[in-house]
């Protein structure tokens, strides 16, 4: 529903427009969490799609992200103090759960990190620390 119009001429142009709307580096500290949801609403409005974007604090050890993904909704995951990404925002697209014999399970979230061409990387879903996320619902 409307997803074919999300691309702004090219992937590069779309990325650059989000970079502007999120005011990345405008405050000399990267992108502030508070600017991400507004950027989604502004971008979608520019391409003629009405949406409601919302910033959520804490992922409840990743379970809230898994719940969104299970309902077929991509999530903008905001990571802090990650061993590889440090403080970086990525698009969460799916997840895998590994079950252990008698020890529960671990969840890994599939992401598009903007550093590689394909969304084929995973981060541990327990989201160590205070990771936040943004959801976007089309109206």
Regions found by a protein language model. Give the residues of each.
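Extracytoplasmic/secreted proteins, especially bacterial periplasmic and envelope-associated proteins
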Residues: 31, 35-42, 60, 64, ...
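Short linear motifs at secondary-structure transitions and domain/linker junctions
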Residues: 50-54, 64-69
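Cysteine-nucleophile protease catalytic domains, especially the papain-like/related folds used
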Residues: 1-55
């Amino acid at each position: 529903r409307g997803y074919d119009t999300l691309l702004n001429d090219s992937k590069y142009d779309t990325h650059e427009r989000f970079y502007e709307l999120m005011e990345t580096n405008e405050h000399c500290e990267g992108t502030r969490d508070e600017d991400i949801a507004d950027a989604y609403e502004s971008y979608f409005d520019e391409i003629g799609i009405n949406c409601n974007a919302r910033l959520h604090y804490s992922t409840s050890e990743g379970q809230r992200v898994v719940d969104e993904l299970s309902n077929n909704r991509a999530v903008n995951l905001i990571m802090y103090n990650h061993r590889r990404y440090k403080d970086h925002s990525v698009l969460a697209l799916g997840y895998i759960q590994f079950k252990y014999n008698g020890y529960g399970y671990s969840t890994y979230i599939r992401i598009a990190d903007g550093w590689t061409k394909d969304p084929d990387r995973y981060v541990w879903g327990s989201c160590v620390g205070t990771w936040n996320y943004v959801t976007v619902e089309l109206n």
